[in-house]
Amino acid sequence: MTPQGNKPSSHDVITGRWTPSDADRAAGRVSGFGVITNIINGGLDC
């Protein structure tokens, strides 16, 4: 539920409090399920 390292809070993404930066948009990261999947599975979480 809290940001870790360079990953935003999944709660903030779900509730719309996170907005992608220009670098995020250029890399194809926009609010939605894909970003949440990357937050949860993008590191050593699973």
UniProtKB/Swiss-Prot annotation:
EC main group: hydrolase
Alphabetical list of InterPro entries matching this protein: Glyco_hydro_19_cat, Lysozyme-like_dom_sf
Described function: Defense against chitin-containing fungal and bacterial pathogens.
Pfam families: Glyco_hydro_19
An individual GO BP term: polysaccharide catabolic process
Protein family membership: Belongs to the glycosyl hydrolase 19 family. Chitinase class I subfamily.
EC annotation from Swiss-Prot or TrEMBL: 3.2.1.14
Entry superkingdom: Eukaryota
Name by which UniProt lists this protein: Endochitinase 3
Source species: Arachis hypogaea (Peanut)
Induction note: Constitutively expressed at low levels.
Start and end residues of each stretch annotated as Disordered: 1-21
Keywords: Carbohydrate metabolism, Chitin degradation, Chitin-binding, Glycosidase, Hydrolase, Plant defense, Polysaccharide degradation
GO molecular function: chitin binding; endochitinase activity
SUPFAM superfamilies: Lysozyme-like
Recorded catalytic activity of this chain's protein: Random endo-hydrolysis of N-acetyl-beta-D-glucosaminide (1->4)-beta-linkages in chitin and chitodextrins
